[in-house]
């Protein structure tokens, strides 16, 4: 016989209570950065969603004797995000270039401006294969974007309706988002360097190990510092 489980919602969340925030409530203003570790800068870009921002990263780097920066994740493609990046380029890089762009996964807030950034700095894109190809297909006007235009958000509405979503209003909203992905990811760089599980990348003299996750995205890359137990 099954027994009901009673939840004590007034009990403290021990996991949350043990989290330590070294910077307290400090946040980097738009167009600025905060250094969270030597050579690691945190920045935020706005998003037009309920979750109204994304955390991005700049890591001081050196490749083949050239000093500069590695970007980790990009923000969505829109004029506001481009302008915020230009402000950062002008004021936060100490006059140094962007050497490469690493994208952790294919969601628009992470990959949206990858093409623009790579073209802006003639920098290579590093990304997992599954997420690069998925983003390439979804942003391609002859691929996922074209299917979305024909089927209504890539068939998402039909899929959700088959699984119980019966609100005509909600289904209409979903069908109206047929070009939702390609609006925020208008294109991808034509080539990339593949990230794989277990890769070790040297960024600014520090070693970062690539760990792949599956679920949040097809092949989500996390970078874990071999020296400081940091994760990005």
List the predicted regions and their residue ranges.
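A short catalytic or substrate-binding loop motif that flags glycine-/basic-rich loops and adjacent residues
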Residues: 36, 49-51, 195, 214-217
